[in-house]
């Protein structure tokens, strides 16, 4: 369970390890 990145309008998952990269989860 990765922390969700506060990004709008699409929910993104925060991946720790790569400068907290935010990936778009569709």
Curated annotation (Swiss-Prot):
GO terms for molecular function: toxin activity. The keyword Disulfide bond applies. Keywords: Apoptosis, Disulfide bond, Glycoprotein, Toxin. The keyword Disulfide bond applies. Glycosylated. High-mannose type oligosaccharides. Disulfide-linked dimer of A and B chains. Lectin specific for galactose (Gal) and its derivatives. Induces apoptosis. Has cytotoxic activity against several human cancer cell lines. Is less cytotoxic to normal human cells. Cytotoxic activity repressed by addition of Gal and its derivatives. Melibiose preferentially protects normal cells from apoptosis as compared with transformed cells. The inhibitory concentration 50% (IC50) is 0.8 ng/ml for transformed cells and 10 ng/ml for normal cells. This is Aralin B chain. It comes from Aralia elata.
């Amino acid at each position: 369970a990765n922390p969700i990145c506060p990004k709008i309008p699409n929910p993104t998952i925060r991946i720790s390890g790569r400068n907290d990269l935010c990936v778009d989860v569709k």
